Amino acid sequence: MESRYCSHAYPAIPGDLQMKIGPYTLHAIETGRFALDGGAMFGVVPKPLWEKTNPPDEKNRIAMAARALLLVGEGRRILIDAGNGSKYNEKLTAIYKFDTTHSDLHRSLKSLAIAPDDITDVILTHLHFDHAGGATISENGTIVPAFPKARYYVQHDHWLAAHAPTERDRASFFPDDYEPLKIFKQLEFTNGEETILPGISVRVVNGHTTALQCPVISDGTTTLFYCADLLPMTSHVTLPWIMAYDLRPLVTLEEKRKILDLATEEKWILFFEHDPGTAAARVKRTEKGIVLDSPVML
C-alpha cells in the first residue's frame, strides 16, 4: 500500500546499530513506569506463581513499563502507542504509581533528536489510558494533540466501544486522551486488518477489549509483532496467564494461541509494551509448550 500522506525529508537520527526491518529503523521508547495490581494482571493464576517473576509491592502492585515503539524510515517518524502521559491528578498518580523520574515520552524522543512536530503518524493499539494517555497534552489549560502534525490511527469499532464502555472497563477510558484527536481533525479510522503504511499492517484482536489493533512490521524476512495487551509482559507467554482486565478471556486464550503458534513457526520478534525488563524477544516450542527464547535488543 502506498503512503496516504506525502513524505518529509528528515536527517538520519543516532543509532547505526539499531535493528532495521525493511526501510524502518526501530527504537524502543520508554515513556515512564507505573504499577497495577498483580492479581488483576494475572487473573486466575495464584499469587505464589506470579510473584516469582513479578514481585509485588506492599499494595500488591507490580512494576510495569509503558513502552512505545518508534519507526523511522520512508521519510516518516511513526510512533506506536504513547504511554500514560502526564495529565493525571495526585489521586490517580498515587493509585497507579506513575513515575517519569527516569524517562518520559518526550525526553526519550528528544534523546533521538526528535521533536513533537517531527512525528508523522501515531498508531494507537487501543484507547486505554496507559496506551493513549500520551497522545494528548495540556497546553495553557487546553488539551491538545501531543504531536500536532501527526495522523492518529484508531480502529473504528474500538472508537465506538470507547464511547459506550461497560461498567467493567469504563475506568480505563479517559476522553481527554482521545477526543482532541477528533476535534483537531488528526484522527483517522482503521477498519479491521489492513495495511496502514508500507510494511506496517495491523491484526485485530477482541479478547482484551473490542477491536484492539496489533501492528505488524515486516519486510518478508523479519517480522515484529507489537503485542500490546494481548501479551503485555513476557510472563503472559504462558497460555492461561491472562489478565482479569480482559473483557473476553476465553477469546484472549485462542488469540494468544494463534499468535504464539505463528510467532514460533515464523520466528517473529514479539514486542512487550509492559514488561519492565524485556522489550522484545522471540519464543520457541518445548515439551512444556511455547516459552520465551532469546531477548532481542531494540
Residue ranges and their predicted role:
Residues 20-111, 214-229:
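Conserved beta-strand hairpin/beta-sheet module of binuclear metal-dependent hydrolase folds
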Residues 96-107, 218-298:
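Cap/insert and terminal regions of metallo-dependent hydrolase folds
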Residues 100-114, 118-130, 146-204, 209, ...:
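Metallo-beta-lactamase
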Residues 31-32, 82-85, 127, 157-158, ...:
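Active-site metal-binding loops of divalent metal-dependent hydrolases
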